[in-house]
């Protein structure tokens, strides 16, 4: 069962409360960029997000597609409470637009699999779609008026004592973090 946005914000705030109370050591987020003087950003990376379609989708014949035009297409999207979907919905609302997906799925890899074999389109971070993109199964759509980015951030409370083990863990996460997304 899908939970509402209120539940998502409540759970997110609970995570930050746990960090403030020293109940958790770190938080790893995938959302809009978080600025808070209580937290230290140990690592962060801006993740590009694109609309994408199968390689034979007729929309790829266009040089530029407006968000308004795109809204008339059939979409498969993640559930509305996912961070990047929430950011897309905010961008749509800012332009007085909305998308009515034909299907909402919680698993983004299932979305990629569906899109590569259909005329539908979707919107996901590049780190999720990069294998499909690099293998030539999907392509990014040239949408000219939607600039949404999500950030992965590793946060720690500013007063948290970092043991050698915690420092080693943070260093490992930074070392093994993903390389930049594929080119557009």
Segments predicted by a language model, with ranges:
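Short helix-initiation/N-cap motifs at beta->coil->alpha
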Residues: 10-17, 104-112
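Short beta-strand-centered segments that line the small-molecule binding cleft or hinge
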Residues: 12-49, 53, 116, 139-141
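Hydrophobic residues within well-ordered alpha-helices
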Residues: 18-20, 70, 113-119, 154
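Single conserved hydrophobic/aromatic residue that forms the stacking wall/gate
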Residues: 1-9
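Ligand-binding cleft/hinge of the Venus flytrap
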Residues: 3, 68, 85-98
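Flexible hinge/capping segments at coil-to-helix
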Residues: 38-75, 164-166
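A late-sequence structural motif
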Residues: 139-183
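A ligand-binding cleft/hinge motif common to bilobed small-molecule-binding domains
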Residues: 28-38, 86, 90, 94, ...
């Amino acid at each position: 069962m899908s939970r509402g946005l209120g539940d998502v914000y409540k759970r997110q705030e609970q995570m930050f409360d746990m960090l403030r109370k020293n109940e958790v050591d770190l938080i790893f987020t995938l959302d809009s960029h978080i600025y808070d003087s209580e937290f230290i950003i140990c690592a962060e990376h801006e993740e590009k997000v694109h609309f994408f379609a199968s390689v034979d989708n007729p929309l790829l014949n266009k040089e530029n597609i407006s968000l308004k035009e795109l809204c008339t297409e059939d979409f498969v999207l993640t559930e509305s409470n996912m961070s990047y979907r929430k950011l897309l919905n905010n961008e749509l609302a800012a332009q007085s637009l909305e998308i009515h997906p034909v299907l909402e799925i919680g698993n983004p890899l299932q979305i990629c699999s569906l899109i590569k074999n259909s005329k539908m389109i979707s919107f996901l971070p590049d780190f999720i779609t990069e294998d499909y993109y690099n293998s030539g199964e999907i392509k990014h759509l040239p949408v000219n008026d939607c600039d949404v980015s999500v950030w992965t951030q590793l946060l720690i409370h500013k007063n948290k004592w970092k043991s050698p083990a915690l420092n080693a863990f943070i260093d490992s996460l930074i070392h093994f973090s993903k390389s930049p997304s594929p080119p557009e």
